[in-house]
Amino acid sequence: MTVRRALVLVALAASPLLTAPLFAQEVVVCGTDELFILDLATPTPRKVWSWRARERPELPEAMRGTFKTIAECKPSEDGRRLLIASSSHGAAVIDRATGKVEFHATAMNGHSIELLPGNRVVIAASHVANGTGDRLSVYDLDRSGVELFHVDTPWPHAVIWDAARQLLWADSQRDVVGYRLTDWGTAAPRLTPAIVAPLPDSNGHDMMPVPDSPHLILSTAAHTWLFDRDTHQFAKHPRLGDAAKVKSVHVDPASKRLLWVQGEGTVWWSEVLHLHDPDTTITLLGEKVYKVRWMPPARPR
């Protein structure tokens, strides 16, 4: 595979990332029209997988231009699938092994996507001046683009399925909401708000589970929080509590290593990946990174 841009390692100390094979050693990265997987287990990180909508013949031609700015890239099912949403108004489910698009839909200012029980998927379409944004939309995975249900919510940016609590968590401009899956065995499913927790400040952004805990890690405009899914209380994150403009944040389930991207200056992107425990930065020269997620490690068959 040709690496199109220089990838420069600024600092990478000896760490669990490099020495323990059960820890994640790859990350999936997005922000532009290229979705790629980066291998961090080498002295210089390298791209080992790449995907672009314009190269996918199974994707309708009209949809290929809706993935110019991929705003979410989330591994699912132990990394066998990649879930993407684009602020250029598209969303898709991709088979990692083949790159094939298994599902696609229009999502105005798409910012997040999640698989749900019953072979369904939910997409968070954030705010647009004109159009059908500010909503969570539910689809069947085998019926691309056919919306079954939507619920209005202002500026949603993240959706997380919580199997233990049987709730879909979604953030918005002002709340974190836990939705119940209602009438889910029918052709007319609904999302019913069960828990509404007002944000401690405005503009919910990224949100991901903290492994082996009741917490979600949640970034807002000015801070990064831990949200307790049982007590519905917020507390500042011990490392990133006062970090503003955190666009992406993720904790590796195995090593518990923290990975994040922070917007630089007035732009929404960064060239720098930040890691904690130990502290490390990785600079990807020429890239515009918005989201980065740990990829689950390959498991023995």
Label the model's feature ranges.
Residues 60-74, 107-116, 153-161, 200-209, ...:
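Repeated scaffold domains used in trafficking and secretory/extracellular systems
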Residues 40-44, 180-188, 229-234:
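Short loop/turn segments immediately following beta-strands, especially the blade-tip
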Residues 51-81, 86-89, 97-114:
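Blade-loop segments of beta-propeller domains
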Residues 86, 126-134:
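Short, solvent-exposed loop/turn segments at conserved positions within beta-propeller repeat blades
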Residues 24-43:
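An edge-strand/N-cap motif at the start of beta-rich repeat modules
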Residues 201-265:
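Loop/turn-rich, solvent-exposed surfaces of beta-rich toroidal or solenoidal domains
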Residues 25, 78-80, 118-120, 164-166, ...:
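Short coil/turn segments that connect the beta-strands within blades of beta-propeller domains
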Residues 47-64, 99-105, 145-151, 192-198, ...:
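A short beta-strand motif characteristic of beta-propeller blades
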